[in-house]
Amino acid sequence: MDREQLREIQSRRLVKMAEYVYHNTPFYRKKFQEMGLEPGDIKSIDDIVKLPFTNKLDLRDNYPFGLAAVPMSQIVRIHASSGTTGKPVVVLYTRKDLAMWAEAISRAFTAYGAGKEDIFQVAYGYGLFTGGLGAHDGATNIGASVIPISSGNTQKQMTLMHDFGTTILCCTPSYAMFLGEAMKECEWPREDFKLKIGVFGAEPWTEKMRVKLEESLGIKAYDIYGLSEVAGPGVGYECQCQNGTHLNEDYFYPEILDPNTGEPLPEGTFVELTFTHLTKEGMPLLRYRTHDLTALHYEKCECGRTLVRMDRILGRCDDMLIIRGVNVFPSQIEDVILKLREISRSEERRVGKECRS
């Protein structure tokens, strides 16, 4: 599909979404009225700049179901964040939403070269966290076998990985680093494992970390991007060219904005990423501010896909440190640490009164 055709789809869906949220979500109807905006004012994707922003505080202020656009009788799944810094952020899915999400993750898995002959070991956490069930549904959607082991119990992870012939591992990159160390120490040589692909997400990781993961596990390591508020894993994914993260922009429309002014900025500028749902029924969000810092690129990828590509997430607006006038992100510190061959894993710890909650 060329960019012009994609833009036509995005325009049709945005026009429909503006009508949908106005008539089904009191929160957005009030926002529209305060701005003097009518659904009919949205005529194409170019008009997205007229729509109001949404942020995490809006979700918490409307906890638990204040942003629902359908009756709870139509909601078939509820996910939520841990709520470590306040009320949990609740996300609602209809049956159609789950099918869309599974399709989005399926695109990622097929881009990595996965198929129905593969055995997925899903070591993301299951439960309120979106990672486990999201990866599970995406794998079953392409007809693959799934080991729903969830996270933890490393010895059992290694045993099942060996005995069941796992070919694809899904987990956080930090846990994958731990599994890589465990593989060195387990009773079987690495050659006895059938692992070939790692799908890593739910936390930022660097190219240096990719190299270490591929060396320790004997795999090709791929990034998968997502956030619970938008859908979960599968919002974006790498292809085999690994030249950026393709965003499923027919479902989730991305913008890059100045984090201070909220103004859109040109392609290639490293700024804040926002998403607008184009098809979601249960709890659609308009211009949701992720606070993730990245850049977008619209030229066609070598793989043939025309979906926009996103640079690796540099960090979050609220994670940035200013050290002697220089902007520094945790990912940059990790990149330096991982250059030391003596270090296989690292973690961030915050100490001090201001970190207590």
List where the protein language model places each region.
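Short, solvent-exposed beta-strand edge segments and adjacent coil->beta transition regions
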Residues: 88, 117, 318-320
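Nucleotide 5′-phosphate-binding alpha/beta core
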Residues: 1-80, 85-103, 107-111, 115
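Phosphate-coordination loops involved in phosphoryl transfer and adenosine-cofactor binding
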Residues: 116-117, 195
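Beta-strand-connecting loops/turns
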Residues: 117-118, 268
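Active-site glycine/GP-rich loop and adjacent strand/helix microenvironment
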Residues: 1-5, 12-22, 26, 142-357
